């Protein structure tokens, strides 16, 4: 019993010994199994039933856990079979290396469990400093010792055993079972050390605990089945723990610890030294030379080189206490060495992915930027170049198995974050990984190209459409074959016609579909997908990147030469250049073998009788004309393309192959340099110098009358690549610039100029379909490109939505596009109509056409070199274009502000600085630095969870904004949660309104971060590329807008002098003609002359004797034509010259062809009256200066501008105005609901756009960088412009007025303090109360918005919109406007009339000013120059506001022009940094300034207008800022006549101003400027009539629209003349 009990105990527990008579008997599990099986066999004899029962028990067995571990070890420690694989090991002779090792994973695991336990102790006791590892392969003993806190040597009260015996000798015991406790240790499941004990023949635990003053030692043997009694001793020293064990090698099928397993264990010792911070590791008595994780990584990368032979660069970052990361380049695919709580996770896991994903995400961004090959790079491909080392501490990690090779815990449970720094990523992108990835990409691209884009020599090839292959191509005579590449199918037909002469055996033809790819800058993907390139390679038999240095290698080609056959124009030259570039980039050696040649055809043929001359360049033809006296007798035919030649001519060309075939010869490195210069992206600055030198050379040649250089003379048989690039291709590059970059003079590109020329010539009185007009342009102006591009040009010229043109030269009759899609929503050109705008001929007076230099194309007189408008249109509508070497970008500026500056310059004053301005833009434009601006939209906080966006930055289109900004904010992404909960849209085609809902917390956060920034309502506008063609046709870079304005002014003033000379001559001739006619009639009536029954000769002789002159007008015109021909013989009109020269003798037809009716009394009186009128007109003209003529044109233009814009405002209101009630007088009422839906909420709090110091610093850095980088290039670009070196003008309007602020009720307007140097152009705030706000223009509309924004000094203070509205309403109440007149004027005033009113008014500093006017429409005081439009903020009276609140709301929406214009006053403001110094923003009224301004204005007005002074409504233009008040009328809202509080006259005054405006709008009503008008204006602006001073301030704000009153009538020089034909030229 005792024995069996002992055995049972031994078998079951394996812990104690059995009883017996003496020694200790050890019974193992296997002994029990053997004994049981023997017993079973003996008992099975003759016992069948029993046998069956025992067999079931054998099948279904229950094992103890210890038995299970020994029976199925792979479940716990991994395989116990030898495994061979690549592993990192540490060998004494080689160090750390990755080699093939054979080891038993189970043995490796039990060693690692003890090792990790030792490392875990560091997390329990930070004072632990040492781990000692001893491995004795000979005696098969392994020992691991560590100091630090030992295991408590105390008896466990529940289990009744000592704690060390419990945790090392009993399964399922651990200190890691409390999952609520966050631990960063390796132990987790309670198996680790026990598994080592179970698989050891001997396992000894020693530990000492200072706390309990005892040491403990106990030994287990025979796979933990036998144990000795623990030895407990008193202990006073330092704590320690030591585990010594002898692995049971038989369980691992091993005989001893071989070299491989020892190397692996040694590596783990090094792992511990690297991953366990602050612990020194001793191995076999020696301290390991590893000091931290970075030192450990060096064991791996030491002596390793990258593909370029450079040592690997390791990037290291200690992210925090728990994360240590190193990164370097991997050449063997992705590699990782990682540790979790000192456990070597050899298979990685989520912690590695967590780090690698961050690195890959950043690196792939860099790769994509630098990847020129076009190969798609995916994250896993980037990962393949990364070697990452991660050492981390994870709370309660989980693994996919007990072997702990792969960590599976989700990142969110790590207990810490590893956010790598930008410094780390920057270093990572420079450590060789990027270069390695790009090299791989390049290799892959090359492989793909070699596979797809190479060809081998075949006698026949298939699958290439339109190829006419040479019969001998690909055969033994292939080197003698030539492939003719033609420009298009029509040219191929010409070549095929010619093949009839030279045969098809050695010549093949292949048509190109246009310009081929510039392969030098193309991506791999582009080259792969380019059918043209692939076809050429296949046809010729080229092998990609193969060298053809050896002439023998050429035999592998199907063709020995390529002949390029293109049109003789500049685009044809470009195609030749691209083909040369294609061959040079890929097979440069082919150029040395004479592989390329070209086939030239005549561009002009001159024939006479049977003689025929061919010219291959225009300069050559011009030279011939110059030296051929009777060239007019020759028939001239121009050949614009190969398609012009007939089949007969084609045969003639090929018959004379020697003349038409030009060989390209390689002359050396200079040829390579020339080709690279023309096509390499790296040679941008060199190209600029190249083109600049060409333009300068051309200018000098023209000045000195020298002919232009040309190729292809009669003796030309070959040319070098250098000559081709510098004499032919450069013409294309220059023409590319001419097509892409506008002229400073008229702001037009050639295509636009052709459209304008055609429209002027057609002079349509009715609208014409855009598609039809495009055809007419192509016909009348010799346009040689596609008509589709022409139609788009016409559409662009007519667009007038916010962000397009400030002044559209064509009318958009139909859907020409809106701000919703940025014009892309325009209807098809077949469905829309257009015609000249009434402003076009006022901007480009017809009388100036006689002074222009018209060009000739195909011997056809086409558009002039440039038109000469009365203001610089390049500033009005801006410019944008990218050419060769240069690009141009110029924003729009306010039309009225430009007009005012021109007037100032005419008066000898300096122009005011100007800020960009876009018509109808209601946001703000603020100056950030020199030529740098910030464009801000408008956003209001309506309540605690609602914001309202009422304006977007310039050229941020509504639909795009919704899709790219609001939708992502609403839906959120994986990384970014949704910011807003909902939004609604209330836009029209002209206005913007998003009502956005968000939670109160998120709104508070967004406001703290800056609503403009969060909602992306700020964009930057940089004007550092103001490159334009000057009047001499040379590109010039302008530093400031003032430079452009001054250069234009000088040229335009000179042309006004020329115009006066021309008019004096023409009017003199007309006067003489009329005088002769009148005298003849009178003498005939008096009987002094008899013409009856006399011969023609006698009549002419008689007239000559009596002093009559030959037709004076005809003679004068002939004299002008002759002078023009002498000046420019090449462009002389042959037909006109020959016609004029054909007649000889005096011409008296103008007298003798008069009808008999001319002798009647009425006709005689009419003729005399006409004669006298012409003489007076001539005398008047002689008394006027060039400046006077210019001022008259400006006045007429401004007057018409008022009418046009008033009509536009009326059109906007179409459909919103109800029908008038029968019998009621007054304006019809607005459909209020429709308006309110699209209007800004009256209760919003405006958020003022902020310019942060960071934005300014960034702008300064960019400026410095630009100055450093551009020093040389600027010198190059500007080598011919010495006159201007100005710096960007400082603020035109220090601050933009916050419309919200302007609406404030307080008498004192709070001004937004601007940081020094910051100028703001603000459109009227979107607050309903301020009409101006409504006027705010989109960043792209210049005119009105500019003036207003400049004028308003925005107060940083945010004022609730509703109060503003009330004020505005009150102000409106002041003005009663008839929709017909006042309202129009109001609109005009809003735009410009504010200025007028202001000019006329004398303003008092009165706290109560028309809110709406003051707030929204600053008016210029009379003191300001007439031209001033700088807005002054007057303080609105709250009561007025309330009355007119509603009206103003409407007004704001529709007062489109937001003027941030600067007037003279404005400039003063700008000059002074102080807010008050600026009249516009000074306290509501600055009387002294105003008076001065008034005097200036009056003087200016006198000087300005030769026309009656009343037309000088220019002040109204200033009033434009009053737009707010006017806006009501604009919208058709009846304005209340109630006089402003206490000042009925104020209302009157307002009315007057309104009437003036109306006059402008309604040509029939023109109110002369009278004192009363001024009064009314006062009233309009303020309740106080004293507001005169204020006026000036406001005027500047609303860019004064020159009042129609100024010069309502244009001076007509010939209008009264009966002989209209003589003046046709002016029409």
UniProtKB/Swiss-Prot annotation:
Name what cofactor the protein needs: Mg(2+); Mn(2+); Ca(2+)
Q: Name one GO cellular component term.
A: nucleoplasm
- Annotated Mg(2+) 2 binding lies at 567, 569
| Regions of compositional bias (Low complexity) in chain numbering | 1131-1144
Site note Transition state stabilizer applies to: 830
Kindly give the Pfam families that the UniProt entry links to this protein.
DNA_gyraseB, DNA_topoisoIV, DTHCT, HATPase_c, Toprim, TOPRIM_C
- What SMART domains does UniProt report for this protein, alphabetically? TOP2c, TOP4c
Q: Which residues bind ATP?
A: 117, 146, 174-176, 187-194, 402-404
Per the record, which residues fall in region Interaction with DNA?
Answer: 368-370, 1016-1025
Task: Provide the alphabetized UniProt keywords.
Answer: ATP-binding, DNA-binding, Isomerase, Magnesium, Metal-binding, Nucleotide-binding, Nucleus, Topoisomerase
Q: Where is this site: Important for DNA bending?
A: 882
Looking up InterPro entries in the UniProt record yields: DNA_Topoisomerase_II, DTHCT, HATPase_C_sf, Ribosomal_Su5_D2-typ_SF, Ribsml_uS5_D2-typ_fold_subgr, Topo_IIA, Topo_IIA-like_dom_sf, Topo_IIA_A/C_ab
Q: Where does Mg(2+) 1 bind?
A: 487, 567
Catalytic activity, reaction form: ATP-dependent breakage, passage and rejoining of double-stranded DNA
Q: Subcellular localization, per the record?
A: Nucleus, Nucleolus; Nucleus, Nucleoplasm; Nucleus
Looking at the record, which segments are called Disordered?
A: 1115-1144, 1224-1248, 1283-1365, 1378-1627
Disulfide-bonded cysteine pairs: these are: none
| GO MF annotation terms | ATP binding; DNA binding; DNA topoisomerase activity; DNA topoisomerase type II (double strand cut, ATP-hydrolyzing) activity; metal ion binding
EC assignment = 5.6.2.2
- Compositionally biased, Acidic residues: which spans? 1381-1392, 1412-1428, 1616-1627
GO BP, sorted A to Z? B cell differentiation; DNA topological change; resolution of meiotic recombination intermediates; sister chromatid segregation
Give the quaternary structure.
Homodimer.
Further details from the record: Eukaryotic topoisomerase I and II can relax both negative and positive supercoils, whereas prokaryotic enzymes relax only negative supercoils.
Entry similarity comment: Belongs to the type II topoisomerase family.
Q: What is this protein called?
A: DNA topoisomerase 2-beta
What lineage does the source organism belong to?
Eukaryota, Metazoa, Chordata, Craniata, Vertebrata
